[in-house]
Amino acid sequence: MAFRNDIDSSKFKFPEPTNPNTCIRDIMEENEVSVKYYLSTVYIDTLKKHKARHESKGNGFGYEIRDLDGKAGAIVCGGMGRERNLIIDKRLTNFVPVTHIKGEVNREGIRKMTPREWARLQGFPDDFKLELADTHLYKQFGNSVTVNVIEAIAKEIRKVLENGK
């Protein structure tokens, strides 16, 4: 953290985590989500083959199905990371696709996280309106800095600015 030379920043400290025990289950949608978030059997097969191909070359690419009681992986710019944050959610009752997919909707309950779940991961409140297409929302949240982190750092900066002159 950088401050002007005329400000005593020696008392600045990065905030401690406030809730290190938050897990994926805590940010999941309360109700059954649309079938559009569930992967097709063909796509899952493609991910498995792609991962095996990369592993055979010693590379680290791969999809990952996250434990609901564990932590989410990084969501990064451009909305990448969706395949590294797959979850199993067996609440789906209607397996009829609402978009064009190859194959059938998987019956294992493997799905990508929803934009609302990504918003929650980034600290956005539930009343934050998600009024764009999912693709744009994934990109926005992937490019976002976690709201709670920025808020906590800003409070510490304010303390320094109020007391540092």
Place the predicted regions along the sequence by residue:
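Short, hydrophobic alpha-helical segments
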Residues: 154-165
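Cytochrome P450 core scaffold surrounding the K-helix E-X-X-R motif
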Residues: 84-88
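Acidic-aromatic/histidine active-site loop/patch
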Residues: 150
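Class I S-adenosyl-L-methionine
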Residues: 1-82, 93
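Short linear, low-complexity motifs centered on an aromatic residue
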Residues: 89-97
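FAD-binding beta-loop-beta segment adjacent to the flavin cofactor pocket
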Residues: 96-132, 137
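Short, solvent-exposed loop/turn segments at secondary-structure junctions
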Residues: 5-7, 78-82, 126, 135-136, ...
